[in-house]
């Protein structure tokens, strides 16, 4: 491996979720913000709910127009 070309790896990076949960992982970033984690994701909680962040269909229609 070449020296001095790799990013600095942090062994204790804080990850904060929109639900308020925080945990520590290793990463090249100082802090990470996520919308879903294992504490609030429907797959892990067993809840039946739709997870659609920022409406993908609406984003598509805004970008390309509603031609239908």
UniProtKB/Swiss-Prot annotation:
The keyword Transmembrane helix does not apply. One of its GO terms (biological process) is translation. Binds 1 zinc ion per subunit. One of its GO terms (cellular component) is ribosome. One of its GO terms (molecular function) is metal ion binding. Keywords: Metal-binding, Ribonucleoprotein, Ribosomal protein, RNA-binding, rRNA-binding, Zinc. It comes from the Bacteria. Its cofactor is Zn(2+). The keyword Amino-acid biosynthesis does not apply. InterPro entries: Ribosomal_bL28/bL31-like_sf (IPR034704), Ribosomal_bL31 (IPR002150), Ribosomal_bL31_A (IPR027491), Ribosomal_bL31_sf (IPR042105). Zn(2+) binds at residues 17, 19, 37, 40. Pfam families: Ribosomal_L31. Part of the 50S ribosomal subunit. Belongs to the bacterial ribosomal protein bL31 family. Type A subfamily. Binds the 23S rRNA. This is Large ribosomal subunit protein bL31. It comes from Dehalococcoides mccartyi (strain ATCC BAA-2266 / KCTC 15142 / 195) (Dehalococcoides ethenogenes (strain 195)).
